[in-house]
């Protein structure tokens, strides 16, 4: 009877792959390190770009979130790094590479602690304690500029935008694009809704040909014969927005009409013409000068509008139609009955202009909602797409800077100051958690270390200089990495600023990701799910 008690009990399906224990935690950490090694070289103003190609497209970028998404990572633990990069991008728009690098460095430090026999739960508790201490110190060191005058505020916003653009492909023109971004955000007024900033791309010309248009602009849609005769400029026009099709439709599949004589066929055709012309006359009678529709506007309607000096555009993208509605005050109509002045919008000036090889419809002086459109120019599609990502990051930074009004000097200076504080704080801890806090402090130094390494300088030498400078009991606590000269620099005096919320989010998200990975002591792989998935090189 006793031998029956020792028989193994099988609960999992045959072929199920399981791995557990401390060795599994280390395997998960090693998988994450592979991802971090790919991304970390993109950090900083001298960071390198990545060329990622698929069957359909080629992408050149150094944006951390974009790189992580395009890697198509399938490893369950490493995919956590993808999630934190995406959440960082959604939340604040920048710091995506930093959050992955810090998380990777925390895991690397944890790996050494695990090998030294420290329990995972103690490491997790220590990391969370260190995170709280670091964030409290960060809040204490933050510089609030809400009491500055408008000129000083604008200058700070400009510096924050330029700092965000420093590590981008357009870093040589950061003054131009920084000014453009700040002007775009300022035009929004109190309604800081990013959806009111449109970005369009036109291939050709120099990136310095990029335009900021105070209004709504979108590319000319497909048009039929007769469009050339329509007026292309209006002053104070009445604008009608539709979600209605204005063209003769072919009969549906297997449709059938039974007639007794040929005259009945003519009456059916005439009825179709009467329906379309009734719709067109309703539009003409409401007094609209411009008609935009999400659905097609056919050749008959195009010629009708041309005869009555009305501009029309069909197949307008939904996002452009919504922005036009918000900017002009027009209401999108799904029916042509009861059209009146209440549903019509207006703007100061409408015109169709040539930009590069494209025609653009532009609505200016929109009083209902302040909107802007940035039209990007550049020689290659991949270049323009990377500029768009850079502009988006800078816009998010400026928006967050306005709403939070808190900044810290960058260039790795804040990380060095927090690292110094954590080292001092760790000495007050009497148990093994002291080692964990010390490791957290060391992990924060990964930002200035990678900044200097990616710039091609001796990171050990620069880190030693920074540690010495920050250990001195002076008010000069804002020394960071000078990526251009290979030395240290006062980030505050040189106006290198970053939004406090970015740094706060980086520390918090990186800590939570590291703690989550450290808390996984067993991985179970279902054989049925494994059979249907193709193995990724990063799994």
Swiss-Prot record:
Q: Which GO terms describe its biological process?
A: protein folding
What keywords appear on the UniProt entry?
ATP-binding, Chaperone, Cytoplasm, Nucleotide-binding
Q: Which InterPro entries match?
A: Chap_CCT_eta (IPR012720), Chaperone_TCP-1 (IPR017998), Chaperonin_TCP-1_CS (IPR002194), Cpn60/GroEL/TCP-1 (IPR002423), GroEL-like_apical_dom_sf (IPR027409), GROEL-like_equatorial_sf (IPR027413), TCP-1-like_intermed_sf (IPR027410), TCP-1_chaperonin (IPR053374)
- Looking at the record's lineage, which domain of life comes first? Eukaryota
What Gene3D superfamilies does this protein's entry cite? GroEL, GroEL-like equatorial domain, TCP-1-like chaperonin intermediate domain
Q: Where in the cell is it found?
A: Cytoplasm
Which Pfam families does this UniProt record tie to the protein? Cpn60_TCP1
What's the chief localization of this chain?
cytoplasm
Q: Please tell me one Gene Ontology term that the record gives under cellular component.
A: chaperonin-containing T-complex
Is-annotated flag, keyword Iron?
A: no
Task: Name one molecular function that GO assigns to this entry.
Answer: ATP binding
The keyword Chloroplast is annotated on this UniProt entry: no
Sum up the protein's function in the record's words.
Molecular chaperone; assists the folding of proteins upon ATP hydrolysis. Known to play a role, in vitro, in the folding of actin and tubulin.
Q: How does it assemble?
A: Heterooligomeric complex of about 850 to 900 kDa that forms two stacked rings, 12 to 16 nm in diameter.
Identify its protein family.
Belongs to the TCP-1 chaperonin family.
Please give the name of this protein: T-complex protein 1 subunit eta
Organism listed in the record: Plasmodium falciparum (isolate 3D7)
Q: What is the lineage of its organism?
A: Eukaryota, Sar, Alveolata, Apicomplexa, Aconoidasida
């Amino acid at each position: 009877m006793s031998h029956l008690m020792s028989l193994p009990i099988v609960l999992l399906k045959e072929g199920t792959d399981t791995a557990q224990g401390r060795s599994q935690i280390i395997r998960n950490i090693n998988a994450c390190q592979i991802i971090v090694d790919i991304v970390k070289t993109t950090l900083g103003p001298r960071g390198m770009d990545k060329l990622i190609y698929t069957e359909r497209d080629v992408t050149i970028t150094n944006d951390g979130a974009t790189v992580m998404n395009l890697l198509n990572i399938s490893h369950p633990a490493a995919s956590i790094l993808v999630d934190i990069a995406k959440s960082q991008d959604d939340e604040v728009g920048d710091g995506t590479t930093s959050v992955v690098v810090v998380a990777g460095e925390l895991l690397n430090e944890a790996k050494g602690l695990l090998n030294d026999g420290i329990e995972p739960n103690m490491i997790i508790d220590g990391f969370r304690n260190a995170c709280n201490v670091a964030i409290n110190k960060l809040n204490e060191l933050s510089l609030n500029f809400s009491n500055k005058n408008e000129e000083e505020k604008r200058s700070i916003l400009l510096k924050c935008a330029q700092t965000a653009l420093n590590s981008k492909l357009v870093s040589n023109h950061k003054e131009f694009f920084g000014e453009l971004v700040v002007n775009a955000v300022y035009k929004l007024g109190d309604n800081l809704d990013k959806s009111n900033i449109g970005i369009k791309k036109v291939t050709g010309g120099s990136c310095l040909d990029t335009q900021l248009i105070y209004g709504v602009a979108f590319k000319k849609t497909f048009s039929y014969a007769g469009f050339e005769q329509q007026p292309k400029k209006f002053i104070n026009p009445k604008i009608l927005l539709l979600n209605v099709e204005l063209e003769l439709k072919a009969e549906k599949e297997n449709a059938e009409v039974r007639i007794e004589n040929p005259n009945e066929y003519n009456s059916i055709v005439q009825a179709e013409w009467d329906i379309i012309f009734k719709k067109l006359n309703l539009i003409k009678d409401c007094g609209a000068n411009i008609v935009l529709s999400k659905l097609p506007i056919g050749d008959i309607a195009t010629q009708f509008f041309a005869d009555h000096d009305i501009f029309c555009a069909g197949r307008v993208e939904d996002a452009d139609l919504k922005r036009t509605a918000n900017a002009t005050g027009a209401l999108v109509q799904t029916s042509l009955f009861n059209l009146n002045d209440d549903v019509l919008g207006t703007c100061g000036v409408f015109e169709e202009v040539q930009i590069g090889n494209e025609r653009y419809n532009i609505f200016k002086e929109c009083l209902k909602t302040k909107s802007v459109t940035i039209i990007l120019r550049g020689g290659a599609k991949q270049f323009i797409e990377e500029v768009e990502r850079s502009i988006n990051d800078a816009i998010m930074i400026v928006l967050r800077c306005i709403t939070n009004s808190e900044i810290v000097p960058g260039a790795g200076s804040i990380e060095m100051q927090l690292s110094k504080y954590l080292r001092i704080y760790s000495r007050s801890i009497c148990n093994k958690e002291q080692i964990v806090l010390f490791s957290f402090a060391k992990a924060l130094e990964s930002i200035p270390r990678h900044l200097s390494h990616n710039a091609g300088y001796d990171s050990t030498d620069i880190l030693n200089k920074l540690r010495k400078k920050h250990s001195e009991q002076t008010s000069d606590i804002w020394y960071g990495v000078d990526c251009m000269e290979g030395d240290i620099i006062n980030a505050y005096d040189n106006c290198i600023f970053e939004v406090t919320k970015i740094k706060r989010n980086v520390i918090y998200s990186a800590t939570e990701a590291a703690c989550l990975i450290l808390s996984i002591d067993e991985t179970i792989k279902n054989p049925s799910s494994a059979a249907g998935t193709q193995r990724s090189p990063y799994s």
